[in-house]
Amino acid sequence: VQPQVGHGLRDVLIELLLLFAVGYNILLAFINAQLFPVSPAMTYAAELLIYAGCFGIGIWTLERHKIAALLAGIALIVGVLLFRYLIEWRVDAKFIRDAIIPFAFLVLGSAYGGSLPRLFLRMAIIVSLVAAVELTVPNVYGDVVNPKSYYVNTRGSDEGGFWNEDSNLFVSATRPGERNFLAGSSLPRASSIFVEPVTAGNFIVFFCALLLVFWRSMGPKRLALSVVLLLFLIVATDGRLAAGTSVLLVLGAPFMRKLDQRLSFLIMPLVILGAAMLVWVTGVSEYEDTTLGRVWLTVHALRNMSAEAWLGLDFDVAYTYFDSGIAYFIASQSIMIVGAFLLAFAFGLEMPTEDGQAFKNAFMLAFAAGLLVSNSLFSVKSAALWWFVLGAMWQLPIGTWFSHLPAPENEQKQLADHAPLAGAS
């Protein structure tokens, strides 16, 4: 009984840490709005606390060869970072943060022994409830959380850039023009616990991928509730990209489940090739703040980036092409790290179940598609969710490949502690 109690307490602690990782901004925004101004240093401290917690809790459960693999990856990043520093005499803390997140949440996820579907259904309920309150009384949400003040104080945003002077919501929450969904209404775009709508949209894509992987092992009531929450959040956030990416995941789900996970490194290059063909077919020739305009920016950036930018030696390029996540990825980390990431992800992060393979491939598809138009998937609020689930699925013992089917008797004991991770409800 004692070990089970210990594991249960650890799982609760892990769940709270994950919720804090994706929702800490709303806590700091509340403090900023109601108690005292929050500085950028406080947001950095919160993130450092999160990463320390991830490693502190999770590292003890990893097998030695997996610890060695993670250390090798960290060593490669440190080596490239040192090389870039010796050439440029410059370090960007944000680029380092981007590289730490996958390792931290892989480690945290590997220590989790609870049910992934139940965990994220609870999280989706929380996100939906806060979004519902925000849509019902947007002025109250704006006064209590005040995203405008929070982003001005912690991100250096220009208050003049918030075009709606009558609202304290995030700038894109009350963008000009009609809503895509519920056109004609005066509703804002919901931000929920994420404080800004883009990350709320990223959560929708993640939750959709999770449902596509685990729906077999969810009961009818939980599955129906999950679908209702997903549709509500799409309408609440008014997320075109979230809706489009979710449709892409639904259409690609059968293929993602069957695609050999070792071929996942091909997904990003194929998505980029598809983007180039889309730009050519549509004839887009300049940047606009639209989905297609941002796709054009990605294609344009990859065609025009200098050799220094590809090698990660021109730090400014990452911010020049801020709306192109792929250009940002290459310029901020270097093409060497990007290539190593794709290969390590495909061949090193081996999933022992079909569900794991399906989620792994779905992540790469969503990641590549999202990076065509945004670099928001590098934020801890979005990236933590994906890497946490990948870590949980990675740490499953080798057993039944089809995790929704019962394991043979000789594998039951080995799988017992981790069965919920495979999707059992």
PLM regions and their residue ranges:
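Alpha-helical transmembrane segments of multi-pass inner-membrane proteins
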Residues: 118-140, 164-236, 245-255
